[in-house]
Amino acid sequence: MVQVKAIKAFSDNYIWCLTTSNNTQAWVVDPGQAEPVLDYLAQHNLTLAGILITHHHYDHTDGVAKLVSENPNIAVYGPTNSPFKGITQQLTDGQSITVLNTAFNIIATPGHTLDHICYVNEQLAFTGDTLFSGGCGRLFEGSAEQMWHSFNKLRELPADCKVYCTHEYTQANLAFATAIEPRNPELLAYSKRVDELRSKNEITLPSTIGQELKINPFMRSDLPNITELLPKEFCSVTKNNEPWENFAGLRKFKDHF
């Protein structure tokens, strides 16, 4: 069974390290820095076997070159249409790969960037900068309609599927979420737990798909009243709004929150 551990990088990034109990191989997801990965591998007597990339941003890819130079035979998996040129195994929507004897499906999730993909199965979802706990990535390249379509793919995963995103943004995301749904009891309870974890400098991840469907306003954009507290300059609230229009309004407000 795959075990997932967080390697901290930069100020708020997590590089996810995948291992199993019966061998010394490791895979990492979105290594924005090489040094924390190399240190972790050395401390735990692990050998790097491969790299998974969700999208091209530097804080997800800058460590790749050094890691490959130290481990020249490893594969670097990533999206086929990516501006990042360090990918050796290109992936498209609907493909599957095997990592440590575990199958992952590739889901194209454009929105944050156009090349973004997620690596998912029924137990684990590596969502990069698409889905955060309590939030979502900024729309740097794609549209709100694209991002909502991407979210709909993730919403179909099992409720107990664990969500491993790449940033410790949970506390800030929940401050926004509670401004949107101040009477959501699940959200208020989750926010309290997250505050307690962060007060001890502990990680708030992984979340689960089921948890996000209860507390993440972006995952709940299909609810007709989700935008009722938005300032009108960000979203015209009508009963006929498409979910992606609600999503767009939420994202615009979050950008100014």
UniProtKB/Swiss-Prot annotation:
HAMAP family: Glyoxalase_2. Thiolesterase that catalyzes the hydrolysis of S-D-lactoyl-glutathione to form glutathione and D-lactic acid. Pathway: Secondary metabolite metabolism; methylglyoxal degradation; (R)-lactate from methylglyoxal: step 2/2. Its cofactor is Zn(2+). Its EC number is 3.1.2.6. Keywords: Hydrolase, Metal-binding, Zinc. It is an enzyme of class 3 (hydrolase). Disulfide bonds: none annotated. This is Hydroxyacylglutathione hydrolase. Zn(2+) 2 binds at residues 59-60, 129, 167. It catalyses: an S-(2-hydroxyacyl)glutathione + H2O = a 2-hydroxy carboxylate + glutathione + H(+). Monomer. It comes from Pseudoalteromonas translucida (strain TAC 125). Belongs to the metallo-beta-lactamase superfamily. Glyoxalase II family. Binds 2 Zn(2+) ions per subunit. One of its GO terms (biological process) is methylglyoxal catabolic process to D-lactate via S-lactoyl-glutathione. GO terms for molecular function: hydroxyacylglutathione hydrolase activity; metal ion binding. Pfam families: HAGH_C, Lactamase_B. InterPro entries: Clx_II_MBL (IPR035680), Glyoxalase_II_hydrolase (IPR050110), HAGH_C (IPR032282), Hydroxyacylglutathione_Hdrlase (IPR017782), Metallo-B-lactamas (IPR001279), RibonucZ/Hydroxyglut_hydro (IPR036866). Zn(2+) 1 binds at residues 55, 57, 112, 129.
